[in-house]
Regions:
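Acetyl-CoA-dependent GNAT
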Residues: 2-15, 19-25, 30-109, 115-120, ...
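C-terminal "cap" of GNAT-fold acetyltransferases
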Residues: 12, 97, 131, 138-145, ...
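Catalytic cores of transferase enzymes with a strong primary signal for eukaryotic protein kinases
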Residues: 31, 35-40, 64-66, 134, ...
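Residues at or immediately flanking beta-strands
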Residues: 71, 132-134
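Short coil/turn segments at alpha/beta junctions that flank glycine-rich nucleotide-binding fingerprints
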Residues: 111, 127-131
Length: 192
């Protein structure tokens, strides 16, 4: 678990994206409690105290290679957590940046924070050498699917029967180029 001081990775407007550290656990738990809709929709459950620790300690599955993994907090000018992101680089292949979670505080839905945060994330990924961007969106999360389509992502695969809490879901794997790299090149590099 990361106990070092938080490291700033990118900024946007009055926000900063920092790596989560152990001292952030109570604030992360409060964020989940104040914004339960995602867990209700995707896992059919209420937030629980262990969600904060799971966010902080989560890593990609052992069968997938990756270079770096970040549990990011989107903090406002007063250091309040208004969003969470999980990012893995070079997953499942060199040049692929995988965004496994992006969650914005419910009270800020519809106010442009997700758009601004995503734009800053994409700029950071591109500046850091990403060739392709990918993510998975749970099929029943229609609002998220539409958001990602507006960001230029296209569905390239469906993974059925993915365990999300106690639920089995269909996950839409979505992709977009971050550099002059084609879908064919991506599929050759990352066949999963």
């Amino acid at each position: 678990m990361n106990c070092a001081p938080p490291r700033q990775l990118f900024t946007f407007g009055t926000y900063v994206a920092v790596e989560a550290v152990e001292a952030d656990l109570p604030a992360i738990a409060a964020f989940y409690a104040e914004s339960p809709e995602y867990l209700r929709m995707v896992e059919a459950r209420e937030p629980a105290p262990q969600d904060a620790l799971e966010f902080l300690s989560a890593v990609p599955p052992p069968e997938l290679s990756y270079r770096d993994h970040y549990a990011l907090l989107l903090r406002d000018a007063c250091s309040r957590i208004d969003g969470l992101m999980m990012v893995a680089t070079d997953l499942p292949a060199t040049g692929v940046w995988h965004l496994s979670l992006m969650m914005v505080a419910t009270r800020l839905h519809g106010r442009g924070l997700a758009q601004a945060a995503y734009g800053a994330y994409e700029a950071w990924a591109r500046a850091s050498g990403a060739c392709w961007l990918r993510l998975g969106v749970v099929e029943q999360n229609v609002r998220a699917r539409r958001f990602w389509q507006r960001q230029g992502y296209v569905e390239i695969r469906r993974r059925e029967g993915v365990a999300m809490g106690d639920c089995l879901s269909t996950v839409l794997v979505m992709w977009k180029p971050a550099a002059n790299a084609s879908l064919g090149e991506y599929l050759a590099a990352a066949p999963r």
